[in-house]
């Protein structure tokens, strides 16, 4: 389901088309535990195409596959304009990178590698039809949320009331997704969120998958031999997880047939969000918040196809699991593009903090003329 608004056209011309999108994060605090038990406090920055760990001075940190330690990174040039980010011997949090000759801040992948990562999310042409654009941009849109955890995890402990407040709070001072879109649309659109499996009082109830978290993380010969090794394997594992989650809900806690989940009557679920327990990891992988399309299989809720979806991580903290992020992702569903600059080798950020589609603030800021 997409919103057709003429001013979207200009913004769409400013970015490359892609089937996946999300809001970027910058300097989000994370903790990593070294093999010897030491705690490493660092940061993560990036988006679903590419993200990296770094310290407070922006020295990139990677995991050494030989011993599992988080270390400072260097680059190795492979050919003109291309390079690889590689681990060094210098353990992050132990040495001062400023004193090590050859270590430099701001290291990341080269432009071509980034573009290759972006293309991995494109929907292959001819494989599946895309949801048609209806032009409907007002009325009641019912957002479906499905909670997910892995076989080696206990239930989500975030109180349901906290999550519901970010989505549905309608009080006068609320900054929820519902209140945001009601305000910016001048009361033309009401977005209500419904949760499955149905919560038990103030306790979240989630679908528990048959496989552990490590199955959905990258393969590592030392630290994760259970992980995926190719991009196709990653996609199949993610899509299969989401398919099982939908099928579980259909069988055990079904969406009522009276709930209109296809506001524009195009045959597709308007918006579905999978909230997965846990937080993001440091390098690009499956478990990072993103929007994609379930293009390689047909999954249905009450006869409506599940196609475009959002994936959010419940444990990613107030910086990312927030109404601001939900509003950014919902704007994608309504047709808005990302306005932040994906990759140019600089910190230039387009319209910057003036538009929710470029950067996220708390509370979420309004859109600009480009959205």
Regions found by a protein language model. Give the residues of each.
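Bacterial N-terminal signal peptides that target proteins for export
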Residues: 1-9
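N-terminal secretory/membrane targeting signals
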Residues: 10-14
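N-terminal signal peptide c-region/cleavage motif recognized by signal peptidases
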Residues: 16-19
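Zymogen propeptides/activation segments of proteases
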Residues: 21-304
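Extracellular hydrolytic enzyme modules, especially secreted metalloproteases
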Residues: 271-273, 277-371
């Amino acid at each position: 389901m997409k919103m057709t608004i003429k001013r979207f056209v200009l913004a769409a011309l400013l970015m490359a088309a892609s089937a996946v999108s999300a809001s970027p994060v910058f300097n989000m605090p994370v903790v990593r535990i070294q093999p010897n038990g030491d705690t490493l406090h660092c940061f993560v920055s990036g988006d679903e195409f590419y993200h990296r760990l770094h310290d407070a001075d922006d020295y990139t940190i990677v995991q050494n596959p030989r011993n599992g330690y988080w270390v400072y990174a260097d680059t190795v040039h492979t050919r003109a304009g291309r390079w690889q980010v590689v681990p060094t011997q210098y353990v992050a949090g132990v040495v001062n990178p400023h004193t090590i000759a050859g270590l430099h801040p701001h290291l990341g992948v080269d432009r071509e590698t980034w573009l290759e990562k972006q293309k991995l999310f494109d929907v292959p042409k001819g494989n599946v039809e895309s949801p048609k654009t209806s032009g409907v941009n007002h009325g009641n849109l019912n957002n479906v949320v499905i909670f997910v955890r892995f076989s080696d995890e206990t239930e989500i402990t975030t109180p349901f009331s906290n999550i519901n407040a970010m989505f549905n709070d309608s009080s006068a001072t609320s900054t929820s997704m519902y209140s945001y879109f009601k305000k910016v649309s001048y009361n033309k659109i009401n977005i209500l969120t419904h949760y499955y499996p149905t919560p038990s009082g103030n306790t979240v109830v989630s679908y528990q998958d048959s496989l552990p978290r490590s199955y959905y993380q990258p393969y590592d010969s030392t630290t994760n031999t259970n992980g995926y090794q190719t991009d196709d394997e990653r996609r199949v594992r993610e899509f299969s997880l989401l398919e099982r989650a939908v099928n579980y809900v259909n069988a055990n806690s079904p969406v009522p047939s009276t709930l209109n989940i296809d506001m524009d009557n195009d045959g597709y679920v308007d918006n579905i969000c999978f909230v997965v327990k846990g937080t993001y990891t440091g390098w690009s992988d499956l478990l990072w918040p993103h929007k994609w399309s379930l293009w390689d299989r047909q999954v249905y809720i009450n006869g409506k196809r599940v196609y475009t979806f959002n994936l959010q991580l419940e444990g990613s903290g107030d910086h990312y699991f927030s109404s601001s992020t939900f509003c950014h992702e919902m704007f994608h569903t309504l047709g808005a593009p990302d306005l932040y600059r994906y990759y140019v080798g600089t910190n230039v950020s387009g319209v910057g903090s003036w538009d929710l589609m470029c950067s996220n603030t708390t509370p979420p800021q309004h859109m600009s003329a480009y959205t």
